[in-house]
A protein has these predicted regions:
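Residue(s) in the substrate-gating loop at a strand-loop-helix junction
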Residues: 147
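Substrate-binding pocket helix/loop in short-chain dehydrogenase/reductase
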Residues: 104-105, 109-117, 201
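Active-site helix of classical SDR
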Residues: 128, 163, 171
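Alpha-helical segment proximal to the catalytic Tyr-Lys
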Residues: 133, 176-180, 229
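Canonical Rossmann dinucleotide-binding motif of NAD(H)/NADP(H)-dependent dehydrogenases/reductases
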Residues: 9-40
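Short-chain dehydrogenase/reductase
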Residues: 229-243
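A conserved structural motif in NAD(P)-dependent oxidoreductases
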Residues: 205-216, 227
Length: 257
């Protein structure tokens, strides 16, 4: 099979991106549009989501936009119904929405823990259940945005880390369950990506720079395209080498632990 330069394009495919008002979600949605996809986006931030939708339209692609909380399964189902009515089928789902707060595990209340579970795991399952029935083209791709914290200890973020690890595990199971439908399921695990939610990040990575949201968007573009059509059940680490470093950090005189 000879590789075709057109294989990176998403011409006239349909993508759904959650948490698309800013940061990584917006970058992915806009990259998909620039590479040819029509994009349905959702977020709780109405003003910034409208900006994302306008930029998708400016790229000459159809934008479907919905202000909603993906933690609510009925709202997610309605959004999926709207996408079906407007765009017929879905080729790509990016589960980007999520969030957390820093606190020692023993200081996290039951209410806080339940919120973290809903925010970082429950909503992913809602979106997958709602969108998979729309993946009827024989080339589906589900991309779950996790974190380096899914693969290492996360002191101060214990429940958040556990939920990201749960999504990584779910990804592997669904890669097997959905494979016969030709739906691929993969993760992207970012680190040191400054976004509006986390501020500046110190640069101690093997690659001596902070990441950019477009670094994650590029990985998502690969996983959405035909270039990755034999890739499923995997995690792509977009972290400047931090996962590989395993505790080593770049300093003024070299690497230290």
């Amino acid at each position: 099979m000879a590789l075709d330069p057109q294989s990176i394009l998403l011409t006239d495919r349909v993508a759904v991106v959650t948490g698309a008002a800013a940061g990584i979600g917006r970058a992915i949605a806009l990259a998909f549009a620039r590479f040819g996809a029509h994009v349905a986006v959702c977020d709780r931030d109405a003003d910034n989501l409208a900006v994302t939708a306008r930029e998708i339209a400016a790229a000459g692609r159809t934008a479907v936009s919905a202000v909603l909380d993906v933690r609510e399964p009925e709202l997610v189902r309605r959004f999926a119904d709207d996408v079906r009515a407007r765009l017929t089928a879905v080729d790509v789902l990016v589960n980007n929405a999520g969030g957390g707060f820093m606190a020692p595990f023993l200081d996290v209340s039951e209410k806080g823990q339940d919120a973290l579970v809903r925010e970082n795991f429950g909503q992913v399952s809602h979106c997958i259940r709602a969108v998979v029935p729309l993946m009827t083209t024989g080339r589906g791709s589900i991309i779950n945005i996790t974190s380096i914290e899914a693969h290492r200890a996360g002191p101060g973020f214990a429940v958040y880390s556990a939920m990201k690890a749960a999504v990584a595990s779910l990804t592997k199971s669904l890669a097997l369950e959905l494979g016969e439908r030709m739906i691929r399921v993969n993760c992207i695990a970012p680190d040191v990506i400054p976004t509006p939610g986390i501020g500046e990040v110190a640069v101690k990575t093997p690659l001596p720079r902070a990441g950019h949201v477009d670094d994650v968007a590029g990985a998502a573009l690969f996983l959405a395209s035909d270039l990755s059509q034999f890739v499923t059940g995997s995690t792509l680490h977009v972290d400047g080498g931090n996962w590989a470093a395993g505790g080593w950090h770049r300093g003024a005189t070299g690497f230290t632990t």
